[in-house]
């Protein structure tokens, strides 16, 4: 998983993958069938193991504002860990459908859409609980905060520090009042 996370689908060579797994190419093909299938397994594993605290905080925070702030702050911490590849495998794993396999791009696109839906549902809960105005555009706000998270992934990959990512979080949260129609809640 970490080879794909660090290098992306296209950048990960078979020799790097087999070395990381401690097996030879025939064993990899026997176990997974293809590099594509291995990547899909790796992204599934990543989705279930990395960043679980980010998505748990989104659900458990008492207010939508706190949920988004924790979501972004925990993202900043996760993306800047020095002992792991920086950024997000789901965001950076394969961005070019013309060079990556269609199934891989489709899978990553689906996962990003699921993340957007989780953000949107949490914001809709804020509307239902009266924290946010009835005309609050939860989909647009979810798109904004997902885009911030994706941008933080790119910045982390480019070497941004945890503090630099937290500055991005502060900037994104400064937009909360505008997005929430003047509500600081």
Predicted regions and their residues:
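Hydrophobic alpha-helical connector segments
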Residues: 41, 55-86, 138-145
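Amphipathic alpha-helical packing segments from all-alpha helical-bundle domains
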Residues: 51, 66, 102-129, 140-143, ...
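Hydrophobic packing within well-folded, soluble alpha/beta domains
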Residues: 3-4, 17, 28, 38, ...
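Amphipathic C-terminal alpha-helical segment
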Residues: 78-81, 125, 145-162, 175-184
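Short, basic, alpha-helical segments at the C-terminal edge of helix-turn-helix-like DNA-binding modules
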Residues: 44-50
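Amphipathic alpha-helical segments used for helix-helix packing
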Residues: 67-68, 81-103
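Hydrophobic alpha-helical segments that form the core
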Residues: 86, 91, 136-155, 168-175
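Helix-turn-helix
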Residues: 3-37, 41
């Amino acid at each position: 998983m970490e080879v794909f996370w660090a290098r992306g689908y296209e950048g990960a060579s078979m020799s790097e993958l087999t070395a990381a797994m401690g097996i030879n190419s025939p064993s990899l093909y026997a176990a997974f069938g293809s590099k594509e299938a291995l990547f899909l397994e790796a992204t599934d594993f990543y989705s279930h193991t990395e960043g679980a605290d980010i998505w748990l905080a989104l659900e458990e925070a008492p207010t939508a504002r706190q949920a988004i702030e924790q979501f972004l702050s925990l993202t900043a911490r996760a993306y800047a860990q020095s002992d792991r590849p920086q950024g997000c495998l789901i965001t950076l794993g394969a961005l070019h459908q013309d060079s990556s396999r269609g199934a891989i791009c489709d899978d990553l696109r689906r996962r990003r859409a699921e993340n957007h839906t989780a953000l949107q549902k949490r914001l809709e809960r804020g509307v239902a609980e009266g924290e946010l105005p009835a005309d609050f555009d939860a989909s647009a706000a979810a798109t904004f905060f997902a885009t911030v998270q994706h941008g933080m992934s790119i910045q982390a990959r480019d070497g941004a520090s945890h503090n630099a990512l937290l500055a991005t979080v502060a900037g994104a949260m400064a937009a909360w009042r505008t997005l929430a129609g003047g509500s600081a809640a």
